[in-house]
């Protein structure tokens, strides 16, 4: 297989008509400023992403094809749009620094959608939807469609984890183009969303705050188990 891309958390290989997305046993924080080996993390995030992509396929089109145990997904190649789309249901993280009058975990009256330009050196700056259009990254109708798809997918995840009594705070998505259509790409895991279960983070926020790799792996195992158990009740 030909390596076509390597990022902080994944390697992507070309394999026939598909790409193989291999998840690393590494965890990073602060746009890669903090990095640690995390044995078993790749398999946990790959399996969880596979489950959640299957679940989300009922509400949005995705690049997911199949799970390749233990730590990879087969996906459809797509032209990735260099914008991260964050959907927030509760105030948290960088939003509190921008608007300190919000309380941590304050419920937002409706989902708040943010666009961030993907650039680690610039720390993925917040940008306006019009700037995405003016920069030629997406057409106006694509920006509208991306926002609608992101809210639909995020709401589906919130509803899924609500069944387990968990509090879905926010999620980061990426989108791409395939045959003139917009599709959800990248991954959906504890690396890309924040989830509180019984008041405890089962996501990468735990590592950001503690730098405890073993504790993160325990929480990712719990997250995968909760997700599987919740699926049996759908």
UniProtKB/Swiss-Prot annotation:
Major enzyme class: ligase
Record InterPro entries: SAICAR_synt/ADE2_N (IPR028923), SAICAR_synt_PurC (IPR033934), SAICAR_synthetase (IPR050089), SAICAR_synthetase_CS (IPR018236)
Pathway assigned in UniProt: Purine metabolism; IMP biosynthesis via de novo pathway; 5-amino-1-(5-phospho-D-ribosyl)imidazole-4-carboxamide from 5-amino-1-(5-phospho-D-ribosyl)imidazole-4-carboxylate: step 1/2
Superkingdom of origin: Archaea
Matches recorded under Gene3D superfamilies: ATP-grasp fold, B domain, Phosphorylase Kinase, domain 1
An example molecular function term from Gene Ontology annotations: phosphoribosylaminoimidazolesuccinocarboxamide synthase activity
Keyword vocabulary terms for this entry: ATP-binding, Ligase, Nucleotide-binding, Purine biosynthesis
Protein name as it appears in the record: Phosphoribosylaminoimidazole-succinocarboxamide synthase
This enzyme's EC code(s): 6.3.2.6
HAMAP family per the UniProt record, alphabetical: SAICAR_synth (MF_00137)
Gene Ontology BP, a term: 'de novo' IMP biosynthetic process
SUPFAM superfamilies: SAICAR synthase-like
Family to which this protein belongs: Belongs to the SAICAR synthetase family.
Catalytic activity: 5-amino-1-(5-phospho-D-ribosyl)imidazole-4-carboxylate + L-aspartate + ATP = (2S)-2-[5-amino-1-(5-phospho-beta-D-ribosyl)imidazole-4-carboxamido]succinate + ADP + phosphate + 2 H(+)
């Amino acid at each position: 297989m030909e390596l076509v891309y390597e990022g902080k958390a994944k390697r992507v290989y070309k394999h026939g008509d598909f790409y193989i997305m291999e998840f690393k046993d590494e965890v990073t924080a602060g746009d890669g400023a903090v990095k640690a080996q995390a044995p078993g993390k790749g398999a946990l995030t790959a399996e969880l992403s596979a489950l959640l992509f299957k679940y989300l396929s009922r509400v949005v089109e995705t690049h997911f094809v199949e799970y390749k145990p233990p730590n990879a997904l087969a996906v459809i190649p797509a032209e990735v749009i260099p914008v991260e789309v964050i959907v927030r249901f509760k105030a948290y993280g960088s939003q509190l620094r921008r608007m300190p009058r919000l309380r941590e975990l304050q419920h937002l009256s409706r989902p708040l959608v943010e666009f961030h330009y993907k650039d680690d050196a610039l720390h993925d700056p917040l940008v306006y939807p019009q700037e995405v259009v003016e920069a030629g990254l997406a057409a106006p109708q694509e920006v509208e469609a991306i926002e609608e798809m992101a809210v639909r997918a995020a709401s589906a995840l919130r509803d899924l984890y609500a069944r387990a009594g968990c509090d879905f705070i926010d999620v980061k998505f990426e989108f791409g183009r395939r045959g003139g259509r917009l599709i959800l790409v990248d991954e959906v895991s504890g690396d890309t969303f924040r989830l509180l279960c019984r008041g405890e983070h089962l996501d990468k926020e735990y590592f950001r705050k503690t730098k405890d790799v073993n504790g993160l792996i325990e929480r990712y195992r719990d997250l995968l188990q909760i997700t599987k158990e919740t699926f049996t009740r759908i």
